[in-house]
Amino acid sequence: MDYKARDILSVLKNVNLSVDAKVTHLLGLKSDIKQKNVPEKAVPVIFECLRHAIASPFHALYSAGFSTLGHFLKRLYIQEHHQLVAAMSDRILPTLVDRMGDNKDRIRQQTTHALADLWEGAGPQIENLVLSVGFQGKNPFQKQTCLNLLSIAFTRSEITAAYAEATAKEYLPQIISFVEDADPTVRQGARALLVQMFIGERDSSKHELKRALEQYKVRPSHAREILAGIGLDPELYDESHSSRQHSIQQRAPSRAATASRAPSRAGISRAPSRAAISRAASRADISRAPSRADTFDERSGSTTTHVDSSSAADDGAPVLHHPKPVRTSPVTGGMIAASDNRIAVTDSIPANDFDSPKQKNTLRTNASKASGMVNAPAGHAAAPSALGHAVEKAKRAVEPLDIEPYDLSSSQELDRLQATMAPWFEGRETEMNFQRREEYTILIRRITHGNAPQRWPTAYLGFVKMTLPFVFITANSVRTSLQTAGLRAVQSLARVNKERLDSSIHIVLQNVLKLCANAKGITSQNSNLTIVAILENVTCNQRVLNQITGAAKDKNQNMRIFSAGWLEIIIDGQNRHKTHAEGVNSIAACIQEGVEDAKEDIRRAYRHTFFRFSSVWPARAKKILDAVSPKTQKLIEKDMLKMSEDPFVSNSGSSATGLFSSTPARAAAKGVTTEKGKASIAVPKAMSSPKLASRSTQPVTTKTNTLQKKPTSTLSSAPMRPGAAKPRPATAAGFQLKKKENESPRKKQTPSRVPEPGLDTPITRRRQNSDPTQNESPTKSGWVAHAADDHHIGPLTIPKRRSTRDTETPRAKASKQADIEVEMDDKNYDGRADEIVQEKVNETVYETVDEMVDERANERVDEYFDEHVDERIDEMVREKVDEKVDEEVDEKVDEKVDEKVDEKVDEKADEKVDEKVDEKVNEKVDSAADDNLQEEVAEKRSMSLSDEIIASAQRPSDEVKERSSEAERASMGKGGSPRPEREYVDSTIVSESPLPKRAVSLWSQNSINAHGILLKGIERIQTRTMATDGYRKLQGLIQHHPDLFADEEQFAVLLIGLLDELAEQTPPSKSVLSLGTVSDHKTQVLFTVKYMFENFKKFFAPHYPGTVVALLEAEKSAEMGGHLIKAIENFIDDIVNASRAHYEIIGAVVTHLGPAVQNEAGPTEHRMLRKGLDVITHGLTSMKEREWELPPDQLERLGEFVRQVMTLPSVALKRRIFALCIALRELVDNEERFWELVGSKTKGVDGLLFYYRTRQEAQAA
């Protein structure tokens, strides 16, 4: 079978044979595998045959390859050759990885079953190579294949199922993230796999999955489906996201209640009566077990707010105020629910009283609060999308804790604990006290969530004031674990104590704000979460606002980004507390600076804050828009249009969605307006002017009120007409569409087109946020703004784009629109109905006008394209075609001429050499009498020109030969048998793109011609005259010809030349770099070495140490870019992994790095030292795993090198030095011998080594 497999391999490689012939041979091999045992010698060859067959683009051949692979693996498992499968799997896994992402379903299914069959013998290899690519890549087909692979592996043998279960648990976060993937098949596959994984697990594991779904913010519908599939009650997920009592007692009002119905006088917020206050106080004083209503009251809100309109500013601008906090019901132990040894505190969230938009910025937390105010004014009622907000409310309603609350038996325990903690927080942080500090900080948090705040509130508050400095000492630690513990303790203090922490709020904010400016990402993020928790729970006064606005103007970028989210919390939480103007002025100034910040991330964050600000104070928002640059205005309008399309960002607490609103909803289907409906649209001019409407102080009629109260559901199932296609932007090349007169913005419409409110006026439903017409161009209508409060109500239109025939400036148009603002008395709430009727009428008219504008615009665009654009496109295409043809013809002609000239020269040279050889041979034959001499003459007759040149090629020096012989001896195992060479898998398969398949010309496919090109290439590389394209041609030859090199010496000559060129500091000549840079040139040199490494591993093995040293030297080049340095480092890692003689690489690297350490290395040497230390550490670790030992002389040299690098001051090098010491200590496995090598046992070195070793053992455990 061995010889037959070799014949089949040659058949598969032969490009001249038909596909049917190859399939026939492969099926014959499959038949033999099914009937006979496979010898071990034939296994590598058969794997190579199957790799060629599976990689084929022909259906018959790759199908036969997959089928043969399945039977081949079954035969090897029957013969118990599992280790052989694991060793040979690297030959075929890269090909299967490529097939995982194929566009054809059949190929992906066959690949999945092949990998499942292979998993029993090569589970770790599949996990490292296949799943890491599929789960971390962006190809949805690869993700889907990996999920299917795990699902199939669960149903296979016990070995495969065990591997699959362990791998799936390791990749559980990625699988959960796939539940929210953009591809629907990936989402479905992830949900099915999670159900399959946990359906038979213990309840504790299922509850861990539930918490993971909550942590990764999986949408409730998907989470309920998964939990129902594994046997958990889906209502558990609902209860953790939103209280059932809250959903019963706090019903979200309909859209009619929020937008159509005028607020009644009874619904207006009024100051509570004395009797109500006394009753509330008396009931709060009664000590009793909390009821369900108490739980709901705490979650829905604990303060009573009101609007003080008497002290408003003269310009109608509302201002900021926070009422005096009132006592809240205590948090009791009955409200703490324990589930699966994890505690969830359902009452540790602040009293929330406003809606929350969906946050778009991932740098900011969801800092808004949920709507829970029962007696709030109608203008601030809950949004109709309350069902969509339920997910965000639930995230704040329950805080999953990883600690257990600590219950006390008496208040004296608090004093004893404080006295016990105090000594450990004195002085500086050391190795002796940092663990105690972390433990006591966690204990403070546990006490906060225990029974102390409820049973002994006075003693507990005293304890908090005494231990608050301890918490901040921990939060300001340099250790990340201590910082996290301190900041989470502050979050718990804020959530549990709420207004009781007001007296210390300025100290808390001052300390946490400093941490927000920390350069460490995890510290700044945790500090941001802490400030969010503080602002959501503690009273916001003028001093707090000053600290937040000061952070918004800080020079630190993190502070400015986070401040945008903090201002949103303040805006949402305090938008009804307006008694003085300083707060709003400060916020407006911060937003104006933020939207024009130099950093794009900050501008984007503040544009979202501007959207929230405009929904509360539209007049101030308009002033900000007028003050910023036109470019900033466009970006704000663009972002606000996207937010208005998002159903979770809509602010429907008033009759408008903010400063701008997109085009009103249209009819369900085009052309449904009947003649009767058209007749009802006719309106007299007297009711069309906004000014006239604003002057009307008479209450609206009963008929109009009836129209207002009609519900306008957003969940209608009526068919919706799809939105019009987006027009080409006016900035497109060759496109200048002129607007018609009748296509001007809506604010230019004549008053006669405004409909009259009456009985026959059809009331169109409000457009749903998911309506496709939301995506239409904003040039058809302005964004209409309506005030979100009762102080400043009136339409405000700002045009987005100026018409080509409009000569007015945007500022002039904005000023005109400011003139038509409706002024309304704050106390005359009946006038509100006029505006609602006007809005309803406008919606009815606008939908008809929009349909007409769409039709006219489409007709005009078609006409313009027919007249101008098609002709211009033809002209441009013609020019580009001519230019491209000229370039291609010149290039191809030059290439063909060069090939013909080389071919003719070689033919003539061969003829002359053959003649000369015949003459010399005849002379030798005449004088020869020995048979051996005649045989030698016959060999010389068969020599060609290429053979003579190869024989006369430059040979490597004696040093090269000596290194090669030493490497061969090193590659032998302990028993004298050669170690198997690892099949090379280039690192670009995982992190970058694979090596490209180079095209080879038909003339170069001849082996004799290829040898000639190789010799010319070696000569040009040695003289540094090889162009960049020449390296690409050389790569193609190396890839195409498996017998390109005559012997190992010729391979060594080319490799040494390439490495010298790569490490050369001086750039090549301008003729070589005529079409590229030095980085491009060296990239091709590196790729040539990688092609040699991949295709000639047997020749390359003796040169591993020298190649690593040369690559380290090449890293010092200042001309290299970051991508090239990364490629070099990946290549070094692959060489070290492939080597079986690590001690040679370690010795070569130590010898090379010695001078750099002694000469006080600079930045480029530091880069080389960092990678060199990593290589030594990697080699020592590999030797420890294989139970190999370093020779004594190399141990001494390595110890001397460690003593030298210990003195280097670089922090990055220090970490690598101690990692090297830890690896050396584990390899030596003798404490005294180790300290003899690295030097005397000093206190500092010993402590640091102990620290790093302890951390490493903890991570491994």
From Swiss-Prot:
BP-aspect Gene Ontology terms: astral microtubule depolymerization; cell division; mitotic spindle assembly; regulation of microtubule polymerization or depolymerization; regulation of supramolecular fiber organization
Intracellular or extracellular location(s): Cytoplasm, Cytoskeleton; Nucleus; Cytoplasm, Cytoskeleton, Spindle
Biased composition (Basic and acidic residues): 804-833, 893-927, 956-971
Protein name: Protein stu1
SUPFAM superfamilies, per the entry: ARM repeat, Phage fibre proteins
Self-association and partners: Interacts with microtubules.
GO molecular function: microtubule binding
Primary role: Microtubule binding protein that promotes the stabilization of dynamic microtubules. Required for mitotic spindle formation.
Species the sequence originates in: Emericella nidulans (strain FGSC A4 / ATCC 38163 / CBS 112.46 / NRRL 194 / M139) (Aspergillus nidulans)
InterPro entries (alphabetical): ARM-like, ARM-type_fold, CLASP_N_dom, HEAT_type_2, TOG
PROSITE patterns tied to this protein: HEAT_REPEAT
Top-level taxon of origin: Eukaryota
PANTHER family (UniProt xref): CLASP (PTHR21567), CLIP-ASSOCIATING PROTEIN (PTHR21567:SF9)
Feature: compositional bias, Polar residues: 301-312, 694-717, 770-780
A Pfam family: CLASP_N
Annotated signal peptide: none
GO cellular component: cytoplasmic microtubule; microtubule organizing center; mitotic spindle; mitotic spindle midzone; nucleus; spindle microtubule
Bias kind Low complexity: ranges: 245-293
Alphabetical UniProt keywords: Cell cycle, Cell division, Cytoplasm, Cytoskeleton, Microtubule, Mitosis, Nucleus, Repeat
UniProt-annotated stretches for the region Disordered: 238-333, 671-833, 883-984
Family: Belongs to the CLASP family.
Each HEAT repeat, start to end: 92-130
